[in-house]
Amino acid sequence: MTLEELVACDNAAQKMQTVTAAVEELLVAAQRQDRLTVGVYESAKLMNVDPDSVVLCLLAIDEEEEDDIALQIHFTLIQSFCCDNDINIVRVSGMQRLAQLLGEPAETQGTTEARDLHCLLVTNPHTDAWKSHGLVEVASYCEESRGNNQWVPYISLQER
C-alpha cells in the first residue's frame, strides 16, 4: 500500500466518523425540535402529504433483518420516492444505538411494543430555514456519495 492509499483510507475512516457523529447529533436535535418522523408507515404518510418538508431519510436495518422481504420492499418504495423528490437518503445499521439515541426504553427494544425505527424522516417546515451542522454535514456526504455513484450511502452507528 502506498502512502497516498494509506492517507486516503485514513481520510475515509475519519470522514465516516464525522458523518456518523453528525447523524447522531442531527437525530437528537431533530427529535428535540419535533422534526423527526419515526416509522415506515408514518413516514409514508408524511411523504404523501408533504414531501417538500422532508430533508433527510434514514433507512435503518441490522444484518439479521436483511432477509425481511416486506421491509426490503418498503425500503425500495421509500428510496424511489425520495429519489423522485430529491430527498437525501442514508442507510444505517446499528438499531440498538439508534434506539438509544432516540431514548427508547431498553425493556421495549426488540419487542412488539418498540417503535418502528426502520425509517426516520428529518423534516424542515417551509416556514423555517432550520440548519444544523449535522444536517449540512450529512447532506454534503450524500452529495459526495452520489458523485461517486453510491446513490444510497451507508453508515454504521456504533454502540456505546
From Swiss-Prot:
One Gene Ontology cellular component: cytoplasm
Biological process (GO), any one: apoptotic process
InterPro entries noted in UniProt: GADD45, Ribosomal_eL30-like_sf, Ribosomal_eL8/eL30/eS12/Gad45
Domain of life of the organism encoding this protein: Eukaryota
Keywords, comma-separated and alphabetical: Apoptosis, Developmental protein, Differentiation
Family recorded in the similarity comment: Belongs to the GADD45 family.
Function: Involved in the regulation of growth and apoptosis. Mediates activation of stress-responsive MTK1/MEKK4 MAPKKK.
Subunit field text: Interacts with GADD45GIP1.
Annotated protein name in UniProt: Growth arrest and DNA damage-inducible protein GADD45 beta
Encoding gene (name): GADD45B
